[in-house]
Amino acid sequence: MEQNGENHLKDPLLQADGGGSGASPAGASPRKERKTRKVMFNVRGISCASCAVSIETVVAGLKGVESVSVSPLQGQAVVQYRPEEADARTIKEAIEGLNFEVDELQEQEIAVCRLQIKGMACTSCSESVERALQMVPGVKKAAVGLALEEAKVHFDPNITSRDLIIEAIEDAGFGADLISSGDDVNKVHLKLEGVSSPEDIKLIQSRLESVEGVNNVECDTAGQTIIVAYDPDVTGPRLLIQCIQDAAQPPKYFNASLYSPPKQREAERHHEIRNYRNQFLWSCLFSVPVFMFSMVLPMISPFGDWLFYKVCNNMTIGMLLRWLLCSPVQFIIGWRFYVGAYHALKRGYSNMDVLVALGTNAAYFYSVYIVLKALTSESFEGQDFFETSAMLISFILLGKYLEVVAKGKTSDALSKLTELAPETACLLTLDKDGNAISETEISTQLLQRNDVIKIVPGEKVPVDGVVIKGQSHVNESMITGEARPIAKKPGDKVIGGTVNDNGCIIVKVTHVGSETALSQIVQLVEAAQLARAPVQKLADRISRFFVPTVVVAAFLTWLGWFVAGQFDIYPREWIPKAMDSFELALQFGISVLVVACPCALGLATPTAVMVATGKGASQGVLIKGGNALEKAHKVKAIIFDKTGTLTVGKPSVVQTKVFSKIPLLELCDLAAGAEANSEHPLSKAIVEYTKKLREQYGSHSDHIMESKDFEVHPGAGVSANVEGKLVLVGNKRLMQEFEVPISSEVEGHMSETEELARTCVLVAIDRTICGALSVSDPLKPEAGRAISYLSSMGISSIMVTGDNWATAKSIAKEVGIGTVFAEIDPVGKAEKIKDLQMKGLTVAMVGDGINDSPALAAADVGLAIGAGTDVAIEAADIVLMRSSLEDVITAIDLSRKTLSRIRLNYVWALGYNVLGMPVAAGVLFPFTGIRLPPWLAGACMAASSVSVVCSSLLLQLYKKPLHVEEVAAGPKNDPDLV
């Protein structure tokens, strides 16, 4: 669909000059070298900033060096260079030439790839893949997720390659397909048109590699497709398409269109499901007749007489038919178990395939022995067990089929997230004055940074951006979990994947591709599902000796029953008809082999973590892996920051006081000039108040005075040189640091302000306090209820703030927090956390990310609240998309529910094996006459894995705690503040 525009692939420059859509590809400057490397040096002897500057100056002057950064505090130098023109040794010698000692260099060129792993069934399998990857030279780090069936590998591309990594996995007996290469960078996949030879593709590749902003180009000559990794700050997919078009020389014509390869994970999952289903159905085609010929028809006349008819000596028609029908099941359909067992034993470990292969082979080859013995003897009579082998394989395949179907549902939440973004967007073409002159519907993947798009009511927001025109309400529940639509006006951010409710808005694109909030959420959840929870170590330890123990137990079971039968320790009537003591013992031994299930143990943790992280993401709670999920359930104390955490984080100046003859506007101008470079909410409040004050005085200028020598004093305030004056803006501690006298009048005003639960910000000019600004930041409406609910969960709440004691105590009293630490700087917050940890408490820290990084990192569990679109917060273990304290409760409650589910899974998996193996070994047989036939034992084994996965799937029914939902449904402030 197109309106007043041309085909967007033929003419990608849809914005007119000055419209802000991006630069022409013709104007993109080609680069001399595409590839760069980064190296880090540990440099000793750096004592000051001037040392760092001297190193940077010398190294930057070397040929081929693109950038250099020296950290005096860490004693490190990071240099990015072009390997064709420079090398690490030359750079090291240059630094040593300045009389600095340089340690051995550490190359930082690490590549990343994600692989789909096929054939993993239990923890032993995932450990085998991980060991195989770690043994590959050049592999730095490898993480394998059993439930996700993926691996993420960090490797040195100078030593190994993706092909060698895949080959190592295949040598270990598993399949591997490349999902993606690169560490989640922006890429576009294009299908080439008009290409007639490999030379054409090479020409296109060279042209693309010369474009500024292109990081890598991968070509598939056979499929005529190309993958381009690019920097969205410099270029974009439409510019790349035009570059391809411009590469053609008449009469040739090149074009490119977006290519969407099949979603590999879903395709592999569906293929695996179809494969197991087909194998099960084929096995039933043979196993059911074997079962009928063995168990049912011999009891029905005249079928019984026919089946017992002797063909040669004592070999009957029934024996021959069962042998012929069972063999395809054993060696064709069951071949996968032989392959899996071979590769496992080859690598020095054992898995479920080993148990299945041993059990079915024992039944099959003993049955073959019986048939051959009957064929060659006129007096021998024996009973074959072909139905055991055939039915066992069929039931195991049925269990695997049900298991992969259930496992596929564990990633439903993640799949729904990936499908939120719309396929198309309405791109506007603007004139020089910013007015829309045409609009064109294009693929969302073709959007570039700074594009301007139109979103009408009911449409999904395609990518992250900022509203530049129009007003509306946007439903963000699918991303943040916020139940109510959020009001949006010019200047507000919108998130890709959310739904525009009732107004038409014009949005400027700010983030595309892998940089969007939705993509970051998906990446974070995928990484979390790859990470192992500490509780998984229990299954890992058990899996190492599980199968050998089962094999020994099965042998001892057979030996015990066989010896007991030979020496008549039990009555002969215990032995079923048509069996002898050896055959009865063999049945018990095979049952023990196949009833044991290591898969259920291996799936207990990863499936629960996978469902929980996906469920949390759908509610705006992003949990960074099983470690954070497990630690959160142990939390006994939570430390809250005040500003932006307990309060709404939108402080405003509500009162001013001048202590000198300086005009109020001049005082505020100087304070705003000093605060303009700070990101703290109080600083923004002062700057905003100054702008409004100017309007009251008749000035409409937004200009803020420039400052020099700006410095942040953590927990105290800021200092700067504004208009030649030393301006200090902060609390009492800042004034004391600069030895500024504080009069009794100032002290009195501070006390009055703090009694009203306001923050008193002092402004000193040239070491004289000239005024004070009273800043109020209202409490979040749910704060009191959230603190009360945490208390009911057995969690104590503590407030640690850099604000004054009076304000802190007033806020704490209002929300119900009993323990308060005030006037604490960011480092002090981390120290308070360590003090609590020394007392044996598991401590969580909740902060808004501003000045809270040390505390978030020091806490056992760091929760960054109100992340919004900024979900890549490194210091936090759990990222909360909204600013609501109810999500803190949701995170901890979800953690507790998940750990309870994992424990239940372990109880079931361990209990099943602990109880199932003795029953299979025949402990009930002497008392009740009940025994577990091998085929039924196999069915029980298959059911155990399915039951564990289904148990984990129950986490999809998780709902927020009742009281918290009541808070969410209650009245709220301005939606912009919540």
Curated annotation (Swiss-Prot):
Cu(+) 1 binds at C48, C51. Gene3D superfamilies: 3.30.70.100, Calcium-transporting ATPase, cytoplasmic domain N, Calcium-transporting ATPase, cytoplasmic transduction domain A, HAD superfamily/HAD-like. SUPFAM superfamilies: Calcium ATPase, transduction domain A, Calcium ATPase, transmembrane domain M, HAD-like, HMA, heavy metal-associated domain. Residues 1-35 are annotated as: Disordered. Highly expressed in roots. Expressed in vascular tissues of the stele, mainly in pericycle cells. Cu(+) 2 binds at C122, C125. GO terms for cellular component: plasma membrane; vacuolar membrane. One of its GO terms (molecular function) is P-type monovalent copper transporter activity. GO terms for biological process: detoxification of copper ion; transmembrane transport. Disruption phenotype: Reduced plant height and biomass. Reduced fertility. Increased levels of copper in grain, leaf sheath and internodes. It is found in: Vacuole membrane. InterPro entries: ATPase_P-typ_cyto_dom_N (IPR023299), ATPase_P-typ_P_site (IPR018303), ATPase_P-typ_TM_dom_sf (IPR023298), ATPase_P-typ_transduc_dom_A_sf (IPR008250), HAD-like_sf (IPR036412), HAD_sf (IPR023214), Heavy-metal-associated_CS (IPR017969), HMA_Cu_ion-bd (IPR006122). Keywords: ATP-binding, Copper, Ion transport, Membrane, Metal-binding, Nucleotide-binding, Repeat, Translocase, Transmembrane, Transmembrane helix, Transport, Vacuole. Residues 37-103, 111-177, 186-252 form the HMA domain. Its EC number is 7.2.2.8. It is a multi-pass membrane protein. NCBIfam families: ATPase-IB_hvy, ATPase_P-type, copper ion binding protein. Belongs to the cation transport ATPase (P-type) (TC 3.A.3) family. Type IB subfamily. This is Copper-transporting ATPase HMA4. The gene is HMA4.
